[in-house]
Amino acid sequence: MGIVKRENIGFDIRLLTIEEDENYDKAKQRVIIGRTDDFLDEHKTIMYYPFAGSIDTRIKMWVRSTNWRLVSSYYGKKDKAQKAAIVEAFKEGDKRMIIATKAFGMGIDISDIDRVYHVAPSSTFVDYIQEIGRAARDKSIKGIAATDFHERDFYFMKRLHSAGAIT
């Protein structure tokens, strides 16, 4: 593997705090909803989520209904025309956030993505580097790679490794 140096990508890694009246899932939802509200400004964000089957349901949970028009999902089982339309809408700024599996990766070249947020850890370090590399391809942009981390997040990594693939 070669050396990759991207000085225009910073990191925003926060420890997920579980409040007294919450469990892990409620705390994660609370934090993601807050992050989603923050991210739906004039910037472009990719939010990586590891499981394709529930992305569309998660959008309804994480994004206020008044902002649904600004968000799309992207995963392997969408057909080629849908994927192309989503990429074009994101590129043009009609969509400000894509909630995606790692299928939103290779071949996607959008230079003005500001933020990449990981709901859970990527399945491998190489995947993580590739995913955060979507941010700030335009060297004049300061990109942010963000996550809210909890030790329970490793559960997702273990599931991904045991499944052998992400769609």
Regions found by a protein language model. Give the residues of each.
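Interdomain hinge/linker at the junction between the two RecA-like core domains of SF2 helicases
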Residues: M1-T36
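C-terminal helicase lobe
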Residues: K26-R30, G34-F104, I108-T167
